[in-house]
Amino acid sequence: MSIYKDKKVLITGASTGIGYALAEELNKRGAEVILTARSEDKLHALAEKIKASGGKAHVFVEDLSIQGSAEALYNQIKSQNLSVDILINNAGYGRWGELTSFERDDYAEMLQLNVVTLTDLCHLYLPDMVKQGGGGIINVGSMASLAPIPYASIYSSSKAYVLMFSEAIRFEYQDKNIKVMALLPGG
């Protein structure tokens, strides 16, 4: 028996890569997946694949690099009477180059997605998880969080935030039956 059976799992950045793979695997383990990303076509294709295998999937198209998008997503999901047992903050990206090679809007968008939206989603869903008697959060960071990386200063710093933030809230909510972890792919 899977610990994910009948759990509702929100996965950001679900249209490709790690998010896509997590959605497929969690479906196999009996979870009901709530998929979000910018790419509507890819999300619907994944949802149809999951449904064809007998699983349950919901699609919410949202560009999480935009300020206020976390609250918009939260409200959309609530409006469909869906609760979230497990939040997987997977959406994120990095750009490479010297710091001054980026325009302010470029790095602001990266920080909005990698740091602010991730924090906002945790802030929105933690009270619900407390009321539900428990839950889980997986924040996808990176091995880049473990050391400063020249030409990836903003990306590696944003992922260091993800790691430290995850460790801090893990401690804050451990006595409320909420498990929090940072996943650090790469290397």
Language-model features, listed with the residues they occupy:
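Conserved glycine-rich Rossmann-like NAD(P)H-binding loop of the short-chain dehydrogenase/reductase
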Residues: R29-L46
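Substrate-binding pocket helix/loop in short-chain dehydrogenase/reductase
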Residues: E98-L99, E103-E109
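Residue(s) in the substrate-gating loop at a strand-loop-helix junction
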Residues: S142
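Conserved NAD(P)H cofactor-binding loop of Rossmann-fold oxidoreductase domains
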Residues: N90-R95
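Conserved glycine-rich cofactor-binding loop
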Residues: K8, S15-G17
